[in-house]
Amino acid sequence: MICFEIKKIFSKAISRISLIVLLFSLVISCYFAITNITYIDNRGVSHTGIAAARNLRKEKQRWEGVLDKAALQAVIDEYRKVNEEYPIRQGDYTANLLHDSKVQGFSEIKDMINMGLCEFRDFNYYRIDSVSKDEVGKLYENREKSLEKWLSSEETEDLFNKKEKAFLLERYHQMKTPLYYEDYDGWKSALHYAQTIVMLVMLVYAFLVSG
């Protein structure tokens, strides 16, 4: 019965065309998902593609693990070392790419430090430059305190009721810390294009069913 239905679908020209369009669209979507990942080499040259994704993954795997105080301090120390050797220069695109090439392996951890030690919903790109050793160990604690402070402000009075605020705080308290870091660029890129792929599949499926 199933074989008969499959033959019935492929016997129609519109069905075959729809499947070809779907296959072509999936290939294009996969191509964009792969080329969406950028790797910067030691010369400051940007690369995309499978090799670039693989190289970036290798860089990030060096920092994979539990983000405890020692790991966070190691990121801060490495970033400050990079800043000394490859400082950011306004308007100097090449110099800035060299800087980025040295930071790309732990850039997401750096951003987490910047956000975790700022006020809630705030981001200071240069916060990591002034982080003290005492502050590093209080990053997770500060994330909870900054959320509590924000939820108790006038800004959130019309956004959340008491139950919703309590729920948000509870979820933050339940979060297992220290966090564990690993590369997720592949998943991030795949999820970015997942909606497009699902829409294409449903569109072609609708043609097949209607036929």
Q: What does each model-found stretch correspond to?
A:
Residues 11-15, 36, 188-191:
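Membrane-interface helix-boundary signature
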Residues 63, 67-70, 74, 82-86, ...:
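Short, flexible helical or helix-coil boundary motifs
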Residues 121-209:
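Membrane-proximal, non-transmembrane alpha-helical segments
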Residues 26-103:
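Juxtamembrane non-transmembrane segments of integral membrane proteins
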Residues 24, 28, 39, 187-195:
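Membrane-proximal extracellular juxtamembrane segment immediately upstream
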Residues 79-141:
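Extracytoplasmic loops/domains of multi-pass membrane proteins
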Residues 20-28, 198-204:
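Lipid-exposed faces of alpha-helical membrane segments in multi-pass integral membrane proteins
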Residues 1-22:
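Aromatic- and glycine-rich beta-strand/loop motifs that create alpha-glucan
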